[in-house]
Amino acid sequence: MEGLKVTPLRGVYEEYGGKIVDFAGYELPTQFKGFLHEHHTVREKAGLFDVSHMGEAMVTGKDAGKFIQYLMTNDINVLKDNEVLYTFMCNEDGGVIDDLLVYKFAEDEFFLVINASNKDKDVKWIMDHKGDFDVEIADVSDSIAQLALQGPLAEEILQKIVDVDLQEIKFFKLRRDVLVDGKKCLVSRTGYTGEDGFEIYCKPEDAKGLWHAILNAGKEEGAQPIGLGARDTLRFEASLLLYGNEMDETITPLEVGMGFFVKLKVEEDFIGKDALIKQKAEGVTRKLVGFELIDKGIPRHGYEVIKDGKVIGHVTTGYKSPTLNKAIGLALVEEQYSKIGTEFNIKVRKKELKAVAIDKRFYTKKTKTK
């Protein structure tokens, strides 16, 4: 695939039967043994993902915390060292520039993990808003590889090849300088599947060795490599949002039900705060809802949502859920049609299929916090 970027793991995909596609300008595996098999493997055992296409940036300096707070909707002040926070970075209108993870290493040292498709845009946005803040900003994406081991057996498997007690790394906490198969890594208890799991950040030259070491450690437990197809169905069932589907620069966090991550009462100003305060006071005019198709069919991204002959929104993500065995989806619709139990139609290939609004938390699994 000419002109596409590759991750440090590009050479190992074919060893495991990987089928390669263009994703966010990268050659990445969409599946290995089939996305249904891979989906169930993560729900029941554990799966290993190459997520080295994600972007990373370091923000350091005396004003690092203040600067991060100015960029983000969540309350950065609550973060202690070695903790992780999910947040949005918005424009002045409250539209989402990106959703990302903020890792706090120290008062003057923060690590940002950003979506692959937004890497260049995000780094430019951050640099453009530096102003008089005493900070240094560095795009470190090319010097880091990232693996994700996800599933109920993730801890058991990874514990075999690390030098720390993984039970000490709680949900949304991190540990630096963990030896994973003898290689220094950053390990956080985070993920994008709705399961327990870890994200492992390493040097690019260590990625292949760690990939093999983790899969070998999980052989008995049935660990498998997982592609992008299952990554999307897993995050979707857990109602984890995808930039470009559920969010973009014209959609606010409040419209997609993510107000918990928008702290309007923080003392400090942040970009988009005024617009979001106004939107909260006036009420949103559209909302993200879950739905189930009553008629037979599969909803897909972009399909129209119709009520009484009028288009009231669109499907943001839709699948036949591998776990629930139902055709379900997420849709951004006019607020008055967002109540659970509301019936509407989804236009699937020129046919209008009946659907009903349901709780968008399709799948929940208790994350280990012990």
Swiss-Prot record:
Keyword check for Transferase: yes
Annotated keywords: Aminotransferase, Transferase
GO molecular function per UniProt: aminomethyltransferase activity; transaminase activity
InterPro entries per the UniProt record, alphabetical: GCS_T, GCS_T_bac, GCST_C, GCV_T_N, GcvT/YgfZ/DmdA, GcvT/YgfZ_C, TrmE/GcvT_dom1
GO biological process, one term: glycine decarboxylation via glycine cleavage system
Main enzyme class: transferase
EC number(s) from the headed UniProt entry: 2.1.2.10
Entry GO terms, CC: cytosol; glycine cleavage complex
KW Endoplasmic reticulum (keyword) present: no
Recorded family membership: Belongs to the GcvT family.
Subunit-structure text: The glycine cleavage system is composed of four proteins: P, T, L and H.
Known function: The glycine cleavage system catalyzes the degradation of glycine.
Protein name, per record: Aminomethyltransferase
Organism: Clostridium botulinum (strain Loch Maree / Type A3)
UniProt gene name: gcvT
